[in-house]
């Protein structure tokens, strides 16, 4: 099969992915005779979402690992699936209904859920189709959805077990409340951004009228729910007031002055109002001091009946204005300062989140279970003991810090879309938790209740079902006999590694550890590879409002400027941003975005996967790695042109005479060198896979293919094929095709499409077409006996000579098209061996080996070890003298300018460190060049 002249990724991707999927190459291995199993879980993306750069990055890493271990011969399962994404999905469907003038309450729960399922079926495949475009290889036949019937059963079973063990309870606690959605939300769904606000200073008079205190607050409306004022116990200003009562302004209540070390002595007046029902820190203070909890807001953030009558029914922000006006009228508003503060907003609604005291369901994090240990304790133990390892290890500190400061987990949400809580209520408020209504009725009857039961309308936090992902996706039932016979559970729990961003270590990683350990007794995974988050080129978070979002599919296929602008400006929360986003996009991508293909994008993602919190995405890298793919394609065409139809003596293994009539074969030092280098890169890549250093894998593969194989070995092999005898030509040809075939397998986990396409042609010629697809072929592993230090040293000397030759041409400004002789003195027999190769690499007419350089030669001489080299060229001494003098004058001027900048105190004080370092480097570089040119001018003598 002849390769196309140019690498066209779109055509290759269209052909190969359906073939891989149709042939069932991604299927989970269940061969019990294999000792090794590899399993990885896809963090389930939102079912109605679309692929973003974070997904593309994360999935590239997971796919590279999966393909690597599949090629290593492991039973392999990459478990895919999607998340029902309670709030996100419900909001989308509610917006669709709003556009028709209908609310979910108009429809009722059952009809509304039908609409959500319709939307899920309509848009639920978008993200998995996009994943396929990324070349991912999960077992699609095992795809799961968190609302599947099987997973729903696992959720119910887990809830019932934890409730029966006393580890799930219902209680009144402070939670993040979204007044627009009318539901509790998780910390991850709250965005804290700095905004301009005010600090109001209010005077609270002592009840006996003898004195007063001034408290400062950013939320004066909540003072209507104050239940104390606190001061630091060591604050001499207020020690005498501790235990006294103050009159709460605008109300008829008196509240105590309490002492608590939470107060910052240095901040404000040192007096802090305490509103336990509307502030998380105050709630903790209230718990410590047994303060009453007075909630003054309704669930839609209007003032309720617990506040004075004049404020009731006001929106919280209108109430703020009214309270401030009344305080001013009373003359007790001491002052108002402008103040920057962090305002918590819902990430989906942008409304200010309200700490709200509501009845919710919680998982007890610190309460001992039946085995005497809390859920949190067990989760800490398995990391402390090394059962679960983090890569990089420093993320253990984050994990421990969160778990050591953990609060009980609020798992209920006031939504309709999600896993409905399996709890039923009797008329008298009794709670019956069961697997079904029938079971709940039976349990109620046991307890003597025979009245009607009403099911809890709330659903579970999406993270609850996600926390069960490691075992719910493997068909766990909770029945010991059934689960013991399940080969998937036996082979793939715990899974091998979890690949995740650091932002969900607590929300997802820790909770999977807790729940899997608590319910199954096993850890969910052995390793956690934590990566940074993809940012734009300037390190900014990618977001719709910033107008810097990139779609991975657009990088694969390309997108025109107008289409890109439309994409970035459609659906903005603030339409006024559209103009500035369009302007920025035109500046950044004046011609739109070129198509790079999947392989180039994947290689870019891998190369960026270095340890750290932030990963700056650089589009130029995509361009560079598209060129890398082109280089590999063209190198393969060169190899095929030189080996197809030729005898490669594939049956023959050693240098020397023929065996059994096969043709003789001879490997040169260069052949042995590239094979030796191949072993080293194979060793390197294997170690980097073990360490999860995908950036170093990409770097090692790139360096070997571009530098060693293409830039050096192909050029040397050309010479060997042109000038060698039959045995040497066979050695070079066989080394070419065998090395290329191994390299394609080596690079396959990162760039699957191009390697599959090329391997299909290369492997049969190399005698290594062992499988129908490269993804099933064995991953190359180093054979140490093939490492040849002597050949490596020899090629390093050859490289040094070639570099010296190129430098001589550069120094003398010789045209690349001009071929001339090279004089070489010293170096012994090795120079004769190198001569033909050096002639080709140096673009020389010949290599002349001489005893010494001509005494009257005016051309510069390069020295490499004991070898001296000089281009044999007639030079116009006068013209060369003028050229060198001008070059020296120019360099001296540039050195003077740079040194002048560095001597300027103002410049040094203002300039960034990087700019100063750049100037210093310029001086060093100019000086080094100057030191080379001055001796050359001196050698030419005076005019």
UniProtKB/Swiss-Prot annotation:
Record text on subunit structure and interactions: Monomer.
One Gene Ontology term, aspect cellular component: cytosol
Annotated positions binding ATP: 544
Family of the protein in this entry: Belongs to the class-I aminoacyl-tRNA synthetase family. ValS type 1 subfamily.
Enzyme kind, highest EC tier: ligase
Primary location: cytoplasm
Motif 'HIGH' region location, chain numbering: 45-55
Intracellular or extracellular location(s): Cytoplasm
Name under which the protein is recorded: Valine--tRNA ligase
UniProt keyword terms in alphabetical order: Aminoacyl-tRNA synthetase, ATP-binding, Coiled coil, Cytoplasm, Ligase, Nucleotide-binding, Protein biosynthesis
Lineage: Bacteria, Pseudomonadati, Pseudomonadota, Betaproteobacteria, Rhodocyclales
Source organism of the structure: Dechloromonas aromatica (strain RCB)
InterPro entries: aa-tRNA-synth_I_CS (IPR001412), aa-tRNA-synth_Ia (IPR002300), Anticodon_Ia_Val (IPR033705), M/V/L/I-tRNA-synth_anticd-bd (IPR013155), Rossmann-like_a/b/a_fold (IPR014729), tRNA-bd_arm (IPR010978), tRNAsynth_Ia_anticodon-bd (IPR009080), Val-tRNA_synth_C_sf (IPR037118)
